[in-house]
Amino acid sequence: MSAVLRKPKTFKLRSLHSEKKFGVAGRSCEEVLRKGCQRLQLPIPGSRLCLYEDGTELTGDYFWSAPDNSELVLLTAGQTWQGFVSDISRFLSVFQEPHAGVIQAARQLLWDERAPLRQKLLADLLGTVSENIAAETRAEDPPWFEGLESRFRSKSGYLRYSCESRIRSYLREVTSGASLVGAEAREEYLRLVGSMQQKLQAAQYNSSYFDRGAKAGRRLCTPEGWFSCQGPFDVDDCTSRHSINPYSNRESRVLFSTWNLDHVIEKKRVVVPALAAAVHDAEGREVDWEYFYRLLFTLENLKLVHIACHKKTTHKLHCDPSRVYCTPAAPRRKRHARHRL
């Protein structure tokens, strides 16, 4: 049958260092390649298509034999792709010892009925691994620092800055909440925010959360820099087992910026308005600003969440009314003087 009369074949296409895929259809390898290059804004000369699974190059002879909805990798001149299982082998070679048994098990997974799901889970891991994972300075891993200002000399230093920037943005939102209270209460509101800012400054804006060199309990990652998604606000864990190591390579560093430090009890909808209401309704009571501080800036109310697990729906959670104000100190009992006999 003439290719012109055939129904276009559909594929899922992505570039070499991207997890994002999109659908493309065509009646020839050349048509699919042309559409893919246009979508990804890549040059057509020197580019080619390979099957994600095993690296087989998609040519005119093989085009109609490829399964529908096959996943393709678009390679430009000089790029190579040996397939998913070969990538596992490359990953394991970092440890400089043979893992033939694991490679064989990985091959079996490809034939398993759940292979697409397992491939994705393994790809999340493999895509973040680099043999420079232990490198820390700009001199040790120059590609990691591409696009960053020269003042960043270490990976940990940049990740601390990244975390601090997020926390500072939260503080700015809290400060802007002063508009929610009347003029008579605004001074008190800003005084409480000032206390929070002083505590944040003393804690370096909790920037240690992203620092793999920080002490356990002060960081969200392993000593090697691996972060795990903590799941949506309404569950205890991530069922997809999302993980990433932004210390491994530039692509993972950029991708990590899309992960969210999500407030379980929502910052803008709940916590900031509750703080404003507490100041307005204080009537002589002392607002427990440290309670609000923990909700706004600490892991008591923050979860690290992959973008796919970040639910933008209303959380329908509220602050604890019993913790909004400081508990009045109990009056000290007077001690009666002893009379000497």
From Swiss-Prot:
Q: Name one GO molecular function term.
A: DNA endonuclease activity
Q: How is its activity regulated?
A: Inhibited by DFFA (DFF45). Interacts with HIST1H1A.
What domain of life does the native source organism fall in? Eukaryota
User: What's its top-level EC category?
Assistant: hydrolase
CIDE-N domain location: 7-83
Name the InterPro entries for this protein.
Answer: CIDE-N_dom, DFF40, DFF40_C, His-Me_finger_sf
| Localization in the cell | Cytoplasm; Nucleus
Its primary localisation, in coarse terms, equals: cytoplasm
Keywords (alphabetical) are: Apoptosis, Cytoplasm, Hydrolase, Nuclease, Nucleus
Q: Which GO terms describe its cellular component?
A: cytoplasm; nucleus
Give the EC number. 3.-.-.-
Q: Which GO terms describe its biological process?
A: apoptotic DNA fragmentation
PROSITE patterns, sorted? CIDE_N (PS51135)
State whether it acts alone or in a complex, and with which partners, per the record. Answer: Heterodimer of DFFA and DFFB. Interacts with H1-1.
Role summary: Nuclease that induces DNA fragmentation and chromatin condensation during apoptosis. Degrades naked DNA and induces apoptotic morphology.
Q: Which PANTHER family match?
A: CASPASE-ACTIVATED DNASE (PTHR13067:SF2)
Protein name, entry field? DNA fragmentation factor subunit beta
| Organism in which the protein naturally occurs | Bos taurus
